[in-house]
Every structure is written in C-alpha cells, then in structure tokens.
C-alpha cells in the first residue's frame, strides 16, 4: 500500500513535461512563465511628473513666467530660470526641475496662456517619479514557473514585450461511465463525474481534449480510447471508476498489465491506478464522486495544473484519525484574529457530493491520531 507522497511522486514521474509555447501577452493571463524575464531598461524609463502642475527651477516658490506646456510624450529639453512650465501627468520632466507643484495650489489655480504669470508656493522636491523607481534595468521581473497575473502582464508589457514563453496547458481525455451510467432503466444514474472533472480541469488551468464513455466491454473500450487519442491528441487520459476488484472493473482489465493498480493509505480515494495507452499516460481514479474529486486535487492538479500549495491551519473541532489510513476531509477556512481556522463540512462518505458544496479546502487528518480543537493540520486549497 502506498502513501500519499509515494503515489504523488509516481504520478509526477509518469506524466509528461509541459510543452513550451510562445504566447501573445494578451492571452497569457493564468499561464505560467516558461522563462525568467529581466528588465531591459528602467521603469519608469525617465523622470516624469506625478501631477498636472508646474515644473519649477527652485523649491522656494515665487512668481514665474508661464512657459510652453509639456504634454506626455513631449521632449521637454531644459527648464529656464524664472520660468514655470505647465506639465501634465506622465510627461518627461525637463532638465533643471527642482520640484513640481499641482496647478490647484497655485494662483491662478488653472493653466493660463503662455507668457502670463503664476504665483507658486514654496515646496520641497515632490511629485517627480524618478527613472528606475519601479524597476531598474537588469532586475528580475518574472521567474520561470511564476503565475502570470494582471500586474505581471502589465510589467512585461511595460518592457515592450508582446509575446512571452509559457507552459501550454495540459490536455486531458476524460473517460467516465459504466453500464449503469446514463441509461434509462430504474437502476441507472446520470453521469456526474464527467462534468465535474471538466469543471475541475477548468478550475486548475487544464484543457479538456475530449470525452469517452466507458462500457463493460474491454476490447471495445480500448478501441474507443485508441481512436480518441488519435482524434484529440491528449497529454493524459483520466479515468473515473472501474479500478477495484469487482466483476466489471473494465479500466483495470484494460490497463493493469502495463501499469500499477493498488491502494493508497487514504480515505476517500484509496483505490488508484497508473498506466499507459501507447505513449499516453493514464491516471485512474475511483468512481465515487468525492473520491474522484479528492484524487484529482491531490494527484493531477498539482502536477499538470495550477493548484495552490497546501498550508497549515488551526482545527476548530476534534477529529480522530483512521487506523492505518489518513483522511482528506472536506472543509472550510475562515480567518480569526489573523489565524487560519479549518472546520469540517459534511460527512466522510465518498458519495456525499452535495455536502461538499461550499468546501474550499481538504483537511488532512493523519492516520492513528487523536486531534483536538486548536491543533495544527495541513489543508489543501480547492480553489
């Protein structure tokens, strides 16, 4: 029987490395950088005005002749003595500027015609954004594997980049079903796992290449999967159900010869499988809905998706660990006095999907332990 860490390592070793692609910056949000990016030049690239106001040659104030207006994008040259130059926000500051005073602090409190006079109060050096005050040339902007959010994209764009190298989202082929799934008889049930897996894939930045319905005929299912691989070119096949020891465990029948099927010392999601179909790895989860959800979060999302890292939280209620198996229970996180607190949500049975609504973490309960309220536990964010 494997531990959680052992099976995670096995899945990680079996799955392919992500492909590196050149991505337009406008489409890079939510992807991870496939290279480290450094600043080519300072940001801001030149001293510029933080306000609409006057560029002044002195901090002492006084009455000045109004010179030509400096708009954003102008090349201002130098600032003559005795002159106040109207300057707009973002405009390059002329040489010789000692300070900038907002127009509303002056008399008149608006911009008069060039050649008029303006009285300006004394002011220390202010409202000048210095070149390199945000980023200096040579500074690392984005590290490889960093998640590209809106500020990251803006910072890269400020360096004149229009494309970046990113890791392409992994593509999965989802295989779910069974004779009892989606039929019309009184003993059949709808397929909830396929849409759930698709939703989980979207949540963790994974693309769904296609779907295959399982049946109880191993040779027919193998042929369906082989055809789907040719059609959809997935990086990974993900299956749900059919991996235990029953009479109709069709996934196990197809893939056991070329893979590993066994148990991980956990609940839910104890039965697990890992195999290949030709060159495509196959990750096999148990079919109970909660087991599928937990398995996806623990073993697939952190390897080919963008799952948040686990962290420690304080348990709000006692919990007793199972003998020989650890648990990953659904729960919620709240913040109290700056401390993350974890509370259980719903029961522990693997079919209780509706009771998982609202859960935002999995709470890890070690085997053979007795936990009290206030103890620290490891939690795995679900979003």
How would you name each of these model-derived features?
Residues 2-6, 20-23, 27, 41, ...:
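Conserved active-site and cofactor/substrate-binding residues in soluble primary-metabolism enzymes
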Residues 45-46, 75, 83, 89, ...:
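Short, conserved secondary-structure segments in the cores of folded domains
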Residues 2, 21, 25-26, 30, ...:
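Flexible glycine/proline-rich
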């Amino acid at each position: 029987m494997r531990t959680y860490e052992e099976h995670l390592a096995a899945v990680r070793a079996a799955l392919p490395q992500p492909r590196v692609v050149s991505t337009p910056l406008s489409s890079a949000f939510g992807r991870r950088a496939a290279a480290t990016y450094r600043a080519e030049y300072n940001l801001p690239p030149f001293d510029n005005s933080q306000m609409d106001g006057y560029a002044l040659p002195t901090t002492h104030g006084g009455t000045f002749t109004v010179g030509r207006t400096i708009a954003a994008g102008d090349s201002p040259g130098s600032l003559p003595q005795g002159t106040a130059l109207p300057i707009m926000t973002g405009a390059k500051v002329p040489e010789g500027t000692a300070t900038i005073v907002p127009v509303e602090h002056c008399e008149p409190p608006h911009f008069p015609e060039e050649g008029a006079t303006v009285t300006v109060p004394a002011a220390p050096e202010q409202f000048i954004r210095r070149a390199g005050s945000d980023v200096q040339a040579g500074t690392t902007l984005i590290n490889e594997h960093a998640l590209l959010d809106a500020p990251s994209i803006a910072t890269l764009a400020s360096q004149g980049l229009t494309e970046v190298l990113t890791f392409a989202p992994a593509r999965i082929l989802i295989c779910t079903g069974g004779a009892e799934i989606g039929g019309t008889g009184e003993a059949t049930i709808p397929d909830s796992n396929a849409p759930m897996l698709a939703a989980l894939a979207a949540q963790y930045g994974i693309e769904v290449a296609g779907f295959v319905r399982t049946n109880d005929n191993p040779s027919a299912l193998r042929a369906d999967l082989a055809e789907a691989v040719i059609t959809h070119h997935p990086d990974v096949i993900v299956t749900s159900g059919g991996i235990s020891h029953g009479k109709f465990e069709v996934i196990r029948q197809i893939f056991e010869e070329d893979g590993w099927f066994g148990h991980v010392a956990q609940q839910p999601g104890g039965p697990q499988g890992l195999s290949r179909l030709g060159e495509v790895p196959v990750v096999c989860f148990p079919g109970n809905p909660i087991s599928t959800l937990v398995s996806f979060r623990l073993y697939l999302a952190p390897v080919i998706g963008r799952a948040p890292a686990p962290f420690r939280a304080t348990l709000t209620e006692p919990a007793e660990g199972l003998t020989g198996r650890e648990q990953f229970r659904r729960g919620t996180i709240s913040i109290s006095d700056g401390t993350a607190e974890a509370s259980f949500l719903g029961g522990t049975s693997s079919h209780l999907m509706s009771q998982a609504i609202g859960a935002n973490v999995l709470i890890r309960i070690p085997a053979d332990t007795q936990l009290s309220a206030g103890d620290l536990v490891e939690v795995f964010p679900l979003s």
